[in-house]
Amino acid sequence: MVEMPSIGKRVKLVADGPAGSTSREGVVLPGAAQDHITIKLANGYNVSYPFDMVKTIEEIGDSSTSESANLSIEQNQDLPKVTIIHTGGTIASKVDYATGAVIARFEPEELLASVPEILEIANIDAKKIGNMWSDDIRPVHWNMMIDACQEAFDSGSVGVVITHGTDTLHVSASALSFAFAGNGGKPAGRIVFTGSQRSSDRASSDATENLLSAVYWAANGSEVSGDGDAAVTVMHAGSGDGICAVSPGVGVRKMHSTRRDAFQMVNGERISEISISREGLSHTPVSKSQNREVTKPTKYDTAIKIAQFIAGPHLHSDLIEAAQKADYSAIIIHGTGLGHLPIENSNGDAPENDELANTIEHSSIPVIVANQCINGPVDLNVYSKGRNQQEIGVLGHGSTASPEALLAKVHWALSNGKDLTILSENLCGENESSLMN
């Protein structure tokens, strides 16, 4: 058997296959299976062969993970200043050929070296908050992002780009929208969230176009109005390349686990689209009528806990009771249809429905309903069941926000002493009133 090279070596191998011998060049990664050799090809894809299929293998060099670590890159100080705030995710990452894993690449020099076109758009500053999976992000990290954005604006940045894992990117975008515009104001510059659905080691990665478009919008986008654009997301508009969508942070949601165009609007429209071509980047016109004043951001009380449940056959009163006993501050239930809950017992054979209704009516903490349909309003005036829910104290009627935007809104309201009757109001673009007419 041919002697296998160590991980990280660049090799040329010849292996047997169903169609005969095949020659491949790439970098050796940890084997995808026992007794296999795996190499990363120049096109970004990985291939694996059983050891006994490899006829010859030749080392042709090493692959370094730090080849750009000591780069000194000169920036154009005349361009708009944009601060990139990194929280994690794959958008600012590269392959560690010693382990085969995707690792953070967030020294500013390395980031600029990987996407040098950014230098033609903006003068880049960078700050690293962390390198977290987005599902590990908590309200304390929202506050860190808020502070980092305000510091960037205070230091002269016209916009910030927050690189973020995609799974909860829309949740953080909602949180910052309320922080900067929930009180009727707006941030001093553009706040742009972006991420990558496909890791940067894949040929189909969306990282470069998303990052380019996000920096472009942070530097050159429309003036912030505070109504839907206090924080925006910039991600692929379709499955193909060339167009990225600018969407309200409070109006967008990740709707697919893997597609590059996973981020879709909920009950609203995109703000703009950015075209990427050989001639450069450009965006469709934007018209905004509001003229809010720039205000300092508010924060989130990290001691607040909000329970979330799903309405359906297994929603029972003991869940509501448990949340109260555990000192939760509020409960959000993702209701069916127009926001309904299983609280009626018309046949007389479902006493758990009566128990649920009684527990909600006497709850010591707010019980709020969101729309598990995602699109459409919570309208508790259409059917008698909805009116009954309002009579026992269920809140949320009139909201058209996504469940994630509603979660951020409830947390923001509780953190800042607001009455939860504001859930039906449009504070910063989260509610589309036309859906209730």
Locate predicted features:
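C-terminal non-catalytic interaction/assembly regions of soluble proteins
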Residues: 2-75, 338-437
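ATP/NTP phosphate-donor binding region
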Residues: 5, 36, 45-46, 53-151
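Internal gly/pro-rich beta-alpha loop/helix module
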Residues: 47-49, 195-276
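Accessory alpha-helical/coil subdomains and C-terminal extensions
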Residues: 85-86, 96, 107-108, 113-118, ...
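Short beta-strand segments
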Residues: 85-87, 162-164, 192-195, 229-236, ...
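Gly/Ser/Thr-rich loops at beta-strand to alpha-helix junctions
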Residues: 86-92, 164-170, 238-240, 337-340, ...
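A glycine- and small-aliphatic-rich helix-loop capping segment at beta-alpha/alpha-beta transitions
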Residues: 98-105, 174-192, 207-213, 252-255, ...
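Short Gly/Thr/Asp-enriched flexible loops that form oxyanion-binding sites at enzyme active sites
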Residues: 162-189, 343-356
